């Protein structure tokens, strides 16, 4: 098994990618490939001691920048660190790619280079957010598909369920549908029709969940279209950052509050860790013929290391194979139904 890293992707590239790779090799004994400017990467790796037999550097001459147009960049920058890494997954030379680079380009590259699993209509981007009751909750989809059909949300539910079981280790994950109310029959046409279809799946489906309960809900997975999911994700991130900012401001306001902060510093550290995105690794793009994991653009070494661990679990868990089996069976059972 090998994981490939887009060495030049991300705000802190290549430093964070290199340090994250080194830490992953030390902790997981994983074989890694990293793509990018070989001289620059070699210089960064020279700062660390690790098993070099676990690392292969593939030289590339181009970088996909954040301001590049996604599809155009994938088609025109064939020797970019991202495209070369995607091709390694396509060719079976790597099991999964980790990239903190241009999100749109990675989504386009996953679709056009790695390719969809046969029968999957739309790949799904899943991102984890903190959850007070469950530790974390997956949002699927969180931005890959702004407009969806009920069939898409059914696929998202099944794929994220497989991912939660195989990668996150949840035995029977709870699945809920994002809606404006808890009662069955609430919501727009997409949500109501999706509710009826998801109910038919062999999942632990618990019904609807409202936005105000996203970080406090008794569910492991929240299903929605990508437009809704991205708003939920960004809102949760914004609330978390605002809360931490308010806490810091409050404790720095006076000598008395600073002393109070010292007394509970371990608890504050736990809170910070709970809402730190780097703890959750990256967001997998499910429904492709290989592992594609999008790390946060500002990922540090810890986030990259955790994303690599996701890639390892993704491959060992045979997520692609399980999704393939599901969609083959589902489409066969529903082949006579009118396309939604």
UniProtKB/Swiss-Prot annotation:
Species this protein is from: Clostridioides difficile (strain 630)
What name appears for this protein in its UniProt entry? Phosphate acyltransferase
What is catalyzed by this enzyme?
A: a fatty acyl-[ACP] + phosphate = an acyl phosphate + holo-[ACP]
Q: What is the main EC category here?
A: transferase
Keyword annotations of the record: Cytoplasm, Lipid biosynthesis, Lipid metabolism, Phospholipid biosynthesis, Phospholipid metabolism, Transferase
Q: Name one GO cellular component term.
A: cytoplasm
Asked if Iron is a keyword of the record, the answer is no
Give a short account of what the protein does: Catalyzes the reversible formation of acyl-phosphate (acyl-PO(4)) from acyl-[acyl-carrier-protein] (acyl-ACP). This enzyme utilizes acyl-ACP as fatty acyl donor, but not acyl-CoA.
Annotated InterPro entries: FA_synthesis, Phospholipid_synth_PlsX-like
Q: What is its EC number?
A: 2.3.1.274
Q: Which gene encodes it?
A: plsX
